[in-house]
Amino acid sequence: MKTAADTVLSPLMAADPGAPMITHYDQTMPSRIELSVTSTANWAAKIAGLLRDELGIMPGDVVVCDLPAHWLTAGVLLGAWWAGAEISTEDVDDAVVVTTPDRLDDHPADVETLLMTTDPMGRPLAAAGVEVPPGVTDLAEACRIHPDAFVPSGGGALALNGAALADLADTELSGRVLVPGLRRDDVVPVLARVFASGGTAVLVTGADPSDPAVADIAATERTTVTL
């Protein structure tokens, strides 16, 4: 079975591999980081390799993703899909958890846990000056040794919270989608819907959606819809 990541990435790679897939404006820095389709796929491949080859994730397994609005969240989402996993936004017994240090205490301590950096440049936690607690894995550090290409073992039937990829698709989200907000707890399902629809995303954090700067970003990035 074809993986959800292949379904998402193949047409984008065929159309224009250098086109932007995920753009992240952090107005608190301020910073702007943009990953092309190819760069996003490279991150996804490394994360898929980590999940399958080191953590034993197989098609149909569940990976819990509790992640903020950040460009690397796109890589985690697609990486899990490439490994054949279904993503859950709620804890599932014995499932691998991918989260950030500030959300670690919200999850069971007795499961395999990967911590995602929120550094603008994607630096591993220690390099960014963030302490890595014992018993958890620094995602950015651990995935670096894996290739930036991935050959999947197979796909799973479900993509997100019990829904198949096709069930997430929405033709209105097939363009450039603006996702603004001071703190978005729905970014994983939002990105899943955008990618399932063939769209790309512009994340804006650190600013209220009503901030005039957000409207300027929307105009600059030529977004077509706001979520």
Functional labels for PLM-detected ranges:
Residues 86-108, 121-130, 165-176, 208-227:
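Conserved ATP-dependent adenylate/AMP-binding module captured primarily in the ANL superfamily
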Residues 66-70, 181-184:
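Conserved AMP-binding
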Residues 29-30, 34-35, 50-52, 74:
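N-terminal pre-catalytic "stem/leader" segment of glycosyltransferase-like enzymes
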Residues 79-83, 187-202:
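Conserved short alpha-helical elements in the N-terminal third of ANL/AMP-binding
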Residues 11-35, 135-161:
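AMP-dependent adenylate-forming
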Residues 41-64, 160-178:
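ANL superfamily AMP-binding
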Residues 1-18, 212-216, 220-227:
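Actinobacteria-biased recognition of intrinsically disordered, low-complexity terminal regions
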Residues 50-55, 79-81, 85:
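Short N-terminal edge-element motif at the start of the domain
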